[in-house]
């Protein structure tokens, strides 16, 4: 439509803002509304509610005395607690919290053996029962009990050899289930025999390194047996609550007799070890015979004396552990535990006779591994001794000093005694460790245990320096790098938490020196990393740590790139989490730049997006925290340095551009030199960013910033660069979920944004009238859109809006200090003619889009575009010109053809919009109003 004569008409009405009328509301407008529908069956309405008897029962409950209810609830809870209490109420002494750790710690690859008669069909076995036939002589009763316990069918004994650890554990689980099943089948003696056979196995130390786990498995079965006996006796003693007092007393007497019978049976066992373990397994049953704490203590002392007959110190130690474990459930006395330790210290030298033997035959078990077998037993016994009582702590420590080869006991003391006691006697402990020479227990092990204790509870303030010096005198004498680094790993928490930065720096320096010898650091990356992590976790200021002379040399120990990168990530993560203040310290900044450069250099073509994103986020955090106050030039210099350092990370470049733009807004001087420097920095940085979208957005941002600060030349350069990138924009991008996402919506939004900005951009004398708009239209014309896309039509329509604004005498908005085209041209007729010509070109482009949509059979989109152009012709163009008026009518007819595909309200609303325009201008411009009225008549008549 080359002969189209477009003439923009002046706006002859005032734009008014219509305020939205408010309305009071009692509910939040975004609150979700829920409707509850109750649907009931009419036939069942008569049965709703509760029956009268239930109502009476409820009323009786409600009328109960509240105190009576409280008493009944308390009694119920007390009974439940008593029923469930098989271990000490204090979680510290509960064995169940330790058993899993023992099973995981003490394992073996050796083959195990097991001898039992209860994992085969036992039809020939006499299950027996717990009742004993009435005998007239006590000797006959004893003989009968022995016959019951000795009645093992030798032919049924099964020796299982070459079992793996897992198979061995499964066999014990089967034995446990067999015991439970026998008990519930009223085969009490069979259950007792299973328990005896299991207890006998505790004398077997063939596979030494598995003995603690073997002890756990067997005592689990003994615990089950003891619980079954106790529960049966308790059920007998409780009786029927409704029975008379005499009946209840007879039942309690019968329970006492049965209990005594169980202890007589166990006392008849000939071998010491199973007799000892079985009596302890039902030790809780002494409650039915006596409630005296003194009696319990007397029994425990008797059992302690029996243990003097066990020769093997390992078997003896775990038997004492079982004794203590059962004793703490009934008595809080510590006397029997102290006596056990007195006996233990007597047999303690025997342990090292075994150690000397294993030193000659390390293929069996090493001395260190053998001594570790005692740790669970010693630890638990010591813990029970000092729990809620420090009566014997000093005595144990004094006896420990007198012992030769006291390392094993000292290890357990450090792991079991209260940290407060250890902290109070810290110098005494360090002297004891320095003097200790125990085969199998190295000083590094003792020092690690002591370091863990003082990290949670430090020594007195005046003793700390002396204590630390004494400790590190010993640590620094360790020649094995593995022992040295393991010690320092534990002590790093103590040093960083309770000492100044100078001690931390000295520690890092000593580590640098020791680990560089023979490149020892190559084998200890994990420990070195843990040391650094613990220091950062416990020291107060990460910035103060970064400026220490030995900090960056410490990082040089991590020569392996993957470890080095992980360490740098860790440091920057701690800086991100624990540094809330800005920094301008040059040393801190250089350290952060050094860390960031390591991360930046690790990024390559094979790096995944998540890795890039994580690294960029860490670097961006410290870039934001580097702040030089009012020294803006120094801040910009830092950004320049950062740009050269982090060349592999687009996200960092985006952050730097935004930071430079923000820096430009802080300029308070009247000179625009610094702002120009910031814009120039951004203009140079943006092309290095790979993503075209981000480049376009940043160019537009920088152009708007330059325009606001009256840097017109730089603004023009930014806008031109942004428009030149449009044809490099890909058609689609990949979303986070892997699906392709079209970029046409982004392009439409971007073009609308830039058109709104170009309204106030003055024309450059070198480029001609409306250069940027011409460039925009040219770029849009070259861009490849989808065939059925509405994106170019929307851009052209908004371009028409922008051109109409250019024809106005006064633009709707301005930027202070910028001479826009309304002031620059002063409504010059030549300028208006250029605007009208461009409007005609834009309309021609829209008409071509209409034709393309028709060819593509997109009638709905075609009709909507026709109506949009129709309204703009009515608003902006001179309808007195016949070509314009006829074009408007043709557009209406085109839209009317697709009426069936449009919303029913679309056409009527369009006509109402034309009527509103007519009402707005009829007083100010009657002639133009008359042309609109004629157009309405032609439209309605068509």
Swiss-Prot record:
The keyword Magnesium does not apply. Keywords: Endosome, Protein transport, Transport. The keyword S-adenosyl-L-methionine does not apply. It comes from the Eukaryota. One of its GO terms (cellular component) is endosome. It is found in: Endosome. Signal peptide: none annotated. Component of the heterotrimeric retriever complex. Acts as a component of the retriever complex. The retriever complex is a heterotrimeric complex related to retromer cargo-selective complex (CSC) and essential for retromer-independent retrieval and recycling of numerous cargos. GO terms for biological process: endocytic recycling; protein transport. This is VPS35 endosomal protein sorting factor-like. Belongs to the VPS35L family.
